[in-house]
């Protein structure tokens, strides 16, 4: 298990107040926690791994507009938008043989994805939503969470024997 707390600040100039302000840096989560468990059978033929991650909330940049209908954000007492914390779960099962092993795993088993990760990326034309990267509001830098759902993978490991 591990836990990280980060208090990253930056100085910004507020033209309305005509002064510098010390604020949380955008898109930096305040905390991250990881809990991992692993079990290997007594004959060492199977191994089971499970990892849970807890990713903390963070401030969004000035001017960020919360997507309509999204519940992934909140506004603090100073009017700043923040993304909420989110969990992730990862797992893997491995079957060992003498010189090789095969494994099956999954990532993002909570299936958490960020709502509308690319700001201003679509326009409506004749009832269809089209991608418009030339739009003046297009911004792909607001990524703070996974943009893909769960993934399943299968793999193979081969160990070369060494002469001792």
Q: What role is predicted for each listed range?
A:
Residues 1-63, 155-162:
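Gram-negative outer-membrane beta-barrel transporters
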Residues 14-23, 64-74, 118-128:
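Flexible, surface-exposed loop regions and adjacent strand-edge segments
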Residues 16-25, 75-80, 90, 115, ...:
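Extracellular loop and loop/strand-boundary signature of outer-membrane beta-barrel proteins
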Residues 17-18, 43-44, 63, 70-71, ...:
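Intrinsic-disorder/low-complexity loop/linker signature
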Residues 20, 24, 29, 82-83, ...:
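Histidine (H) residue identity feature
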Residues 27-33, 85-89, 98, 148-152:
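Residues that define the transmembrane beta-barrel architecture of outer-membrane proteins
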Residues 51, 62, 67, 72-83, ...:
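Extracytoplasmic gating/loop element in the C-terminal half of outer-membrane beta-barrel translocons
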Residues 54-65, 95-164:
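C-terminal beta-signal and adjacent terminal beta-strands/loops
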């Amino acid at each position: 298990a591990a836990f990280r707390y980060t208090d990253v600040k930056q100085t910004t100039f507020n033209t309305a107040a005509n002064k510098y302000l010390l604020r949380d840096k955008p898109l930096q989560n305040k905390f991250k926690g990881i809990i991992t468990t692993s079990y290997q059978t007594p004959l060492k033929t199977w191994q089971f791994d499970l990892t849970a991650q807890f990713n903390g909330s963070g401030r969004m940049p000035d001017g960020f507009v919360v997507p309509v209908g999204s519940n992934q954000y909140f506004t603090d007492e100073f009017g700043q938008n923040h993304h909420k914390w989110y969990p992730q779960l990862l797992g893997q099962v491995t079957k060992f043989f003498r010189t090789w092993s095969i494994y099956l795993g999954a990532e993002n088993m909570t299936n958490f994805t960020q709502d509308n990760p690319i700001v201003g990326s679509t326009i409506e034309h004749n009832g269809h939503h089209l991608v418009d990267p030339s739009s003046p509001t297009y911004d792909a830098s607001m990524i703070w969470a996974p943009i893909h759902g769960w993934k399943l993978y299968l793999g193979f490991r081969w160990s070369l024997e060494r002469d001792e």
